[in-house]
Amino acid sequence: MLENIQAYLSKQGVKYIKPEKAGLHQEEMEDLKALAQSARKEMQVLSKALEERLTPFKMDRVSNWANQAQICRPHFWCYYKAPEDSLDDVAMAIRLYGQPKDWGVSVEVSFIERKKSDTTLAKQHKVLDLPIAPSLYYFAQENGVSHRVEGTEDNRQMLKEAVRDKVLVKYDVPVTTSETIEELVEKLADGFDKLKPYYEKANKN
């Protein structure tokens, strides 16, 4: 299951060069592009299957397999928004994490960077108004650097008092080779249920 995603995770940071310009590496680059496109397709299938479990949420597009500098970005993400959400509201998302031998999909309460407004960060910070539930954790960004923060009451208070660029609430779902897409979707849907109160709190006026 999701074999192409798993294989593509090892390509984090690899520079893609158009095959016709890659000289001796032409075949290698053709293989890389084929793998990247197959991995993204798997992520699209997973995201769509999850969307069907998350009515009325609608998925946004899955992130590209490389950035503008043509550096491979295998940790795909996909945002989900409810019909009544405005462009700059806080959203829910899934995002890949890890390396081929130890990887998974995290569910998070986050926002789309390119659509944020002056009020988006203030909305996002409201996730700290609710006590943190078991199995959830924070992902705090400070001066552009993000790091994991254990989900404890002490840390919640610490994050509330300190000004952070961005604080996400996240839930990790490790992926095993033996499980099916349907089983993974159920676990991710459960993650959405766990995080929904934080999403609702963030968007409440």
Regions found by a protein language model. Give the residues of each.
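Short, internal acidic amphipathic alpha-helical interface segments
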Residues: S110-K166
